[in-house]
Amino acid sequence: MKKILVLGAGAMGSAFTVPCLDNENAVSLIGTHLEDKFIDQMMQNDNFHPVLKCKLPSKLKLKRFEKFAEEFKEKPDLIVLGVNSKGIDWAGNEISKYYTSEIPILLLTKGLTIIDNQYETIAEKLKRILEKNGLKKINISAVGGPCLAAGLTNKVKSSVVLANQNIDIVKSIGKMISTNYYSTEFSDDLIGVEVCAAVKNIYSMIIGASRGLCSSSASEEIK
């Protein structure tokens, strides 16, 4: 049994705990400092996630952010980041306080940032933050692919790509999280997978917006 720590109780971070638990791992879902009330609400309602509109497995350990440090008393085998792209700076600084060399970090967060007028992937940004805080031997992987949080929670068959410059690392992560409904492929092109995942989301938003604008129920204000 592996110990998996998921930071961020949003839709995808929460949904990701389902295959992790089905693979018989010990999984903790830690809300961010902005999600304390959200975590309390879930615990009071039998792990019911109001966004996903379903109950998460009873084996899942839900915790407020104040318990984050305690999770490192016994080193986790995998840290999963499920915060949005605007929270990467905060998450990187918080992880820096407790991170020890070579714990694998898996990014669910997708997007591109700009630094010095150049594009930067989320993995590059996180690595830069951790290095700025004095950490070395940083181990960051990313996931890309057509996978929806609601589908994953309901165990709809999904296929994703795990990327790391060291492909053996993502193969090891794959063994922790792969199930018969959540299949994983592997790539050593971390930047390529991240860029494609971000661009794919841009197209998805454009298509979604176009469908909404063409809907007969769309108001003139929206159009």
Residues of each region from the PLM?
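Conserved active-site and cofactor/substrate-binding residues in soluble primary-metabolism enzymes
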Residues: 7, 11, 15, 37, ...
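Conserved beta-strand segments of alpha/beta enzyme cores
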Residues: 26, 61-63, 104, 139-141, ...
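NAD(P)+-binding Rossmann beta1-loop-alpha1 motif at the extreme N-terminus of oxidoreductases
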Residues: 1-56, 60-67, 115
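Rossmann-like NAD(P)(H) cofactor-binding subdomain of soluble oxidoreductases
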Residues: 65, 73-156
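Short beta-strand/turn micro-motifs composed of small residues
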Residues: 8, 31, 107-109, 144, ...
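Internal alpha-helical scaffold of NAD(P)-dependent oxidoreductase catalytic cores
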Residues: 98, 132-139, 157-223
